[in-house]
């Protein structure tokens, strides 16, 4: 059984990674508010072990409002209301699954526990400043994560929504993985083809064809 520690454990000893952590520490030390909290930065890896990954859902950088980001792409901790992009994901789920019920929260931990790696490509952000840590070096780290999944696993579903995610995933081997692309679920672009993309059902169709247990997208109310 391969773990994240086996696959990317040596990243943490690399100078570029030490530099990322130093920049995050420096930002916090200077009084800036950085999201998510330090203990939550690597939550995606804690909740979805390397050999348990079935689906990779790429986000961009964490939510930059108070109490939103907790280390899982698109997800927010209760009682924070689901942001617009996540609401649009729920709407698409309702379109694909008529019996899907809108959850009363925005936590996607149940997806993560089933094998959906909710990976932002940049893992920290300054409060109120979208993309403020985009040049810290996180992209190098998450490129290595995606590369490891691409090389060492097979029959994964990669959900690439929006041009940033699609560019990030352009090297994925489509002969051994399923790559699904659509516009981002943001209100700015959801109507250009995210709605009606069918990705949630297509994901489960692919998993089923390869004898992999499907994702139950329905989230329990809390």
From Swiss-Prot:
It is found in: Cytoplasm. Its main location: cytoplasm. It is an enzyme of class 3 (hydrolase). The active site is at 61 (proton acceptor). Pfam families: UDG. It comes from the Bacteria. GO terms for molecular function: uracil DNA N-glycosylase activity. Keywords: Cytoplasm, DNA damage, DNA repair, Hydrolase. GO terms for biological process: base-excision repair, AP site formation via deaminated base removal. The keyword Cytoplasm applies. Its EC number is 3.2.2.27. It catalyses: Hydrolyzes single-stranded DNA or mismatched double-stranded DNA and polynucleotides, releasing free uracil. GO terms for cellular component: cytoplasm. PANTHER family: URACIL-DNA GLYCOSYLASE. Excises uracil residues from the DNA which can arise as a result of misincorporation of dUMP residues by DNA polymerase or due to deamination of cytosine. Belongs to the uracil-DNA glycosylase (UDG) superfamily. UNG family. This is Uracil-DNA glycosylase. It comes from Actinobacillus succinogenes (strain ATCC 55618 / DSM 22257 / CCUG 43843 / 130Z). The gene is ung.
